[in-house]
Amino acid sequence: STMDPDEPITRQEAMTVVARALQLNLEDHEETSLSQFRARADISAWALPYVRAMVGSDYIHGNEKRELAPRDNITRAEFSQIFHNIIQEYLLTSGTYTQDYAGNLLIRTDDVTLRDLTIDGDLIIGCGAADGTITLDNVTVTGRIVVWGGGTDAVWMNNGTDVEDLIVCRVDGPAKVIFDKDSTLAVYQDIEVTVTDRAEAFPE
């Protein structure tokens, strides 16, 4: 419950921060078993739901001793490994992309167009997208779209882009997500949109 910016953080603190940043659904992982790990009783009660979510999402595998070591300070190498487990592909350069992606994709720049492709995982629009435009043109996302960046110039969903779960969580400014006029409600009747408490979202 305290902030110590100059102090190391523990593994369970790191898992909590990452799970929150990814907006993992804790309820989806309430039944996730941690029985494969030793000393799991060391996990603090406040961190347990987030640790379950990270394990249940296959982002945390424990160490060679089958330990989560939740109270140990996390190393840079361990933190890097967590992100390697989470993100399979990064887009760092503006432009148009047409290849399919297997696993989670993170966009870290603005003015990106994804066209005629499938993302077999989550699409995370990171803070690096800032206030730029992100366009999905005939894109299928099998996981979630998590919007941390992209401003009022908008994140565009065009030409039958297929999305099941959309989470808007930008906290440093407004973010607009627009489904184009050629798309019908029938295409998106099962869509689930979540706007986090601190985020601002504006319709067209």
Located regions from the model:
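Residue-level marker of positions within ordered structural domains that often coincide
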Residues: 19-20, 84, 128, 150
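Feature responds to low-complexity, polar/acidic, surface-exposed segments characteristic
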Residues: 1-48, 60-77, 85-99, 123
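Short, T/G/N/S-enriched strand-turn elements that build extracellular solenoid repeat scaffolds
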Residues: 91-169, 173-204
